[in-house]
């Protein structure tokens, strides 16, 4: 099939109550992402929630791998109460989300794993 190159970017943003540093990290990353000529997948522990300015900035122009509403929380793994792990693909029109879910199994991290199957469109 199609053998197009993509860029995969994994991140783990800082966790502090005040989001100033995290947002600064996001602005620097956004500058880098804007230079890419390849389609990309951005994923990781954003340590921020969906309505944050960090997520607003980094999700612009992307296809978000949306989690099932009833099972979207990823942290803490034993009894998750917040959604801070995300997967985005850009540019939006190049990608299709085929499947997504938060996995609930043997605990190997303080976060539950988030799985998404995204397909690069021809």
Named regions from a protein language model:
Residues 1-11, 118-122:
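Beta-strand-turn-beta hairpins that frame and shape the catalytic cleft
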Residues 19-21, 27, 31-41, 46-122:
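Metal-dependent phosphoester-hydrolase catalytic domains
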């Amino acid at each position: 099939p199609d053998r197009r190159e993509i860029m995969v970017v994994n991140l783990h943003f800082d966790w502090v109550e005040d989001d100033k540093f995290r947002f600064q990290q996001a602005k620097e990353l956004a500058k880098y992402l804007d230079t890419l000529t390849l389609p990309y997948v951005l994923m990781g522990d954003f340590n921020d929630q969906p309505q944050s300015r960090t997520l607003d900035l980094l999700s612009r122009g992307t296809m978000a791998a949306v989690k099932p509403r009833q099972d979207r929380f990823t942290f803490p793994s034993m009894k998750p109460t917040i959604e801070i792990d995300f997967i985005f693909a850009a540019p939006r029109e190049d990608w299709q989300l085929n499947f997504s879910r938060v996995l609930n199994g043997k605990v190997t991290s303080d976060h539950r794993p988030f799985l998404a199957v995204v397909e690069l469109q021809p």
